[in-house]
């Protein structure tokens, strides 16, 4: 029986959009459905006051993979935005990631030698306090890696806001390493390439899905597709939540989520940077995003008379919220593994993306994954 589609893709995020693009290039017919009223998943931008607002949080594309970079640039041109966040701790500003600028701001040190001596001295105090045992929690682990001042100013309260738990209650493995740069360099990423699509991420998604049949406001689980997809398509590409696909039969996986308060400010420049992290408990949000700085530089910032900011709050996931980050503790890792084993047994179903694989991915690795797949 000839079916109408080669692929039915559930979810219109980066995994599905890249997959549909490659399948269409190979002459296959695709249908993409998404329960949201828009395409693009979490990279979707909303235009407010002429500014592309990252509706689901800051998305900064970065990779060292030349093939991935050339692929996305073949769809849309990327600008040269460089991520250089600033941390605000009780009104004092520090450059991120931890580098010579940060150490000068914290201690007044001006040479790598002085900075290293200060860090090593504080690390030694933390190691001595453990009396020969391994760190038992995130707090002990971070103190051993960077020492007291950096931990208490830039890590402790920020991490507690992000996770909704105290650092002494979080497992040590969350922080494997904390890179310390003994150079004056505020570029957050070590990757060779980074930037934002010129005109916003919708341009990237629209380019990937050009000529592909797409339907929004369609919930896979509340539609004819849930039980009838095999009559319509040869293969299902599923990028929704892994546990939801199986009706939560083994139990629910936990997620962290974020929420945003977005508002227009009647001034051209609110904070002078795209990303400012608030690393103390006295401010309820974890960071403030000023969206225009992703795409407007120099005089362009002032040519646009208003600006849009989003305060980002990290919260416990509840029914009806958008799942963002997998909770990679022992219980959830084991449960996810059980679901993955079920997924492997599903015939003609590909599970993809952050939700479908219960793994945190940056954007570039998702695209890299799809580029490596045999789609035909």
Sequence positions of predicted segments:
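N-terminal Rossmann-like FAD-binding beta1-loop-alpha1 element of flavoenzymes
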Residues: 5-32, 374
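Short hydrophobic core segments
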Residues: 8-10, 33, 230-243
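Short, solvent-exposed loop/turn segments at secondary-structure junctions
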Residues: 13-16, 37-39, 101, 160, ...
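Glycine-rich FAD pyrophosphate-binding loop
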Residues: 24-49
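N-terminal glycine-rich dinucleotide-binding loop that anchors FAD/FMN and/or NAD(P) in oxidoreductases
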Residues: 46-71
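A short alpha-helix-loop-beta-strand transition element characteristic
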Residues: 68-90, 150-153
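Active-site/ligand-binding neighborhood in enzyme catalytic cores
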Residues: 87, 92-94, 101-235
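C-terminal segments that line or cap access tunnels to active or ligand-binding sites in enzymes
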Residues: 234-235, 244-375
